[in-house]
Amino acid sequence: MRKIFLPLLLVALSPVAHSEGVQEVEIDAPLSGWHPAEGEDASFSQSINYPASSVNMADDQNISAQIRGKIKNYAAAGKVQQGRLVVNGASMPQRIESDGSFARPYIFTEGSNSVQVISPDGQSRQKMQFYSTPGTGTIRARLRLVLSWDTDNTDLDLHVVTPDGEHAWYGNTVLKNSGALDMDVTTGYGPEIFAMPAPIHGRYQVYINYYGGRSETELTTAQLTLITDEGSVNEKQETFIVPMRNAGELTLVKSFDW
């Protein structure tokens, strides 16, 4: 006697329902493929705004000099959270706004670049790869320092003293020797980025200042990534993890010669 397993077969062929509310990363910029690294309307340094400032971006920021997108199915979270941003191998926190959007300016190096954004729940990620051809107005940053930290509503500041005695900090963001600090992030996570296309020879000193937080004794962990000769065969990256325990603390993280 033949047995028919039709109900079982129907179950096996039924489509599997997708979970609702799963976060999904969408990157709107940069675009994939080949495009010129245009410098026009590509702002690196941002305005310093108080009492609090998160990463902001000019309305006319060149699309080739920004990272922007959204997290779909994020609205249910309804609050600011921390995602992850990985640019050319350098990982840093990325602030995700309460509506799921994210945006920050970023001056990419000429040549091959990659951008990956990871959702706050860690379950979704999207990676964009592109090649920036030589354009007008852009200069490769031979020295880049990226500061980030792991708590919201805390303020860490990056201070860089160059060999000629110039001091980059939130009160002096653009130096005469080609160095510049992109912005002062006072609401948490960062990143704050110092870049220098033509480093001068001598000793550099890099400090982190714990300016303030939700409490005077809240522990936050800083991450400093030192990138040299980015985008070339000689590129090197070095990352330092630094516990910051008390507001007002100033720590010399790295001293190096160029």
UniProtKB/Swiss-Prot annotation:
InterPro entries: DUF2135, UCP012281. Keywords: Signal. Gene3D superfamilies: 2.60.120.380. The keyword Signal applies. Residues 1-19 form the signal peptide. This is Uncharacterized protein YfaP. The gene is yfaP.
